[in-house]
Amino acid sequence: MSGNWVHPGQILIWAIWVLAAPTKGPSAEGPQRNTRLGWIQGKQVTVLGSPVPVNVFLGVPFAAPPLGSLRFTNPQPASPWDNLREATSYPNLCLQNSEWLLLDQHMLKVHYPKFGVSEDCLYLNIYAPAHADTGSKLPVLVWFPGGAFKTGSASIFDGSALAAYEDVLVVVVQYRLGIFGFFTTWDQHAPGNWAFKDQVAALSWVQKNIEFFGGDPSSVTIFGESAGAISVSSLILSPMAKGLFHKAIMESGVAIIPYLEAHDYEKSEDLQVVAHFCGNNASDSEALLRCLRTKPSKELLTLSQKTKSFTRVVDGAFFPNEPLDLLSQKAFKAIPSIIGVNNHECGFLLPMKEAPEILSGSNKSLALHLIQNILHIPPQYLHLVANEYFHDKHSLTEIRDSLLDLLGDVFFVVPALITARYHRDAGAPVYFYEFRHRPQCFEDTKPAFVKADHADEVRFVFGGAFLKGDIVMFEGATEEEKLLSRKMMKYWATFARTGNPNGNDLSLWPAYNLTEQYLQLDLNMSLGQRLKEPRVDFWTSTIPLILSASDMLHSPLSSLTFLSLLQPFFFFCAP
């Protein structure tokens, strides 16, 4: 990860290309651009309602394929190529259980082509207004997809509308997932966090190449949703990513979401599983790595279903310390940020994947039993949770609604607000939002009680209603929803351009200062103040104080103790 991505034999050739060859506009076969590794040729598309064509470059390599001896290592430089490289086909997905994507298409009312799946997946897609060329210096937005770090793809997100309407460059990045992105031996032989290091490599590629597509390497905004937002939040805290971006947007995810690290007993159990798989001693890290690098990728994908501890780790490189400690110590660069949540984060999508039975209703006893198992709160203190969330709720549907609100609070809202406060207190400009609109397209697929569910804002941010290619992100949008999408694209792009989302013809979005005002994103915009303040106080003051007086733990508890108590919920409400 030295950052030296230029093959020595390419330096002179590349310099000649820059001086001698035109890079402007599409050729008869498609737009061509040079990179430091060789020439690529993309395609040109248009979107609904905009006269601006967009140059699209798909499957651009930012690192070498992580195969064989490169499995479970830091991403390495991609090799240069001599001939014009075709960049009009979607890259393979990183290895994953692709059945989830089929389920998501139905649940999220989206459609996209069938993609291949491979370990050879470290590619990015670029969307640029056709007029953009070297010297244009347009703002760059780099998107990291979500999917619980287990599923996801760059190609299900089409940046064409955002690029056309807002005159920005959009880059969508793939990174290793699951065991391929996070396997670790918890020592120097395989320190882990490969997925995050892939993201650093992609940002390094952007710094070195995006100017040839018309982007400004000194104005890069990273953004993402769910696991992608967790990635953005993590990159802010990592010294490895220092200087590679300048602004950040976190949609429904931050680095202190609690499920992201494993218990010690889970680590030990999982190493035993891997050792048994390889026929090695679990203490021999080098032997385990040699074995795993020779195994077929599908066998490793199957193996990963038997493990749950291969997640984020404090490796001393990407994460020099726990994210919460880095935040509290202000050990990060204070850059402008947008942080936000939806008003029903665990309303349907997440529980539907893992525990659909609770959506039909829940009695108080069942709800409290589930909460006890999730939060590890001693039974004698469950009455506090009951009083906070269920004291005036009696029907099965009322209790269900409160349970879903509780889960959304614990896993999304409270961590997001805590993170916003840390960023604010470090001197960074912060803008907070709550997305509140339920898309009309879900009228026949989601129950009426569901409001703005997890991931619902994404189709608005990307202008899904204006796409007309083979990626369908927003069918059946109403005219009001199209207007909301235009406003949200404008907010995001204005922020990418200036570090402040406010602009002409947009409702005022105040900074998140000590008054804690925030923008309620809806068909009719409005301002709110101190979002869910009683619930934040409950989880950061009342519960930790009670638990610190109990015998369940042997060390003092901080006001954020609840963040470390929720890991068993990983497979229930993973973003």
UniProtKB/Swiss-Prot annotation:
It is found in: Secreted. The active site is at residues 226, 345, 454. SUPFAM superfamilies: alpha/beta-Hydrolases. It catalyses: a carboxylic ester + H2O = an alcohol + a carboxylate + H(+). One of its GO terms (cellular component) is extracellular region. Its main location: secreted. GO terms for molecular function: carboxylesterase activity. The keyword Disulfide bond applies. It is an enzyme of class 3 (hydrolase). Keywords: Disulfide bond, Glycoprotein, Hydrolase, Secreted, Serine esterase, Signal. Residues 1-20 form the signal peptide. It holds the Pfam family COesterase. Its EC number is 3.1.1.1. Glycans are attached at residues 281, 363, 513, 524. Disulfide bonds join 94-121. N-glycosylated. PANTHER family: CARBOXYLESTERASE. Belongs to the type-B carboxylesterase/lipase family. Involved in the detoxification of xenobiotics and in the activation of ester and amide prodrugs. This is Carboxylesterase 5A. It comes from Homo sapiens (Human). The lineage of its organism: Eukaryota, Metazoa, Chordata, Craniata, Vertebrata. The gene is CES5A.
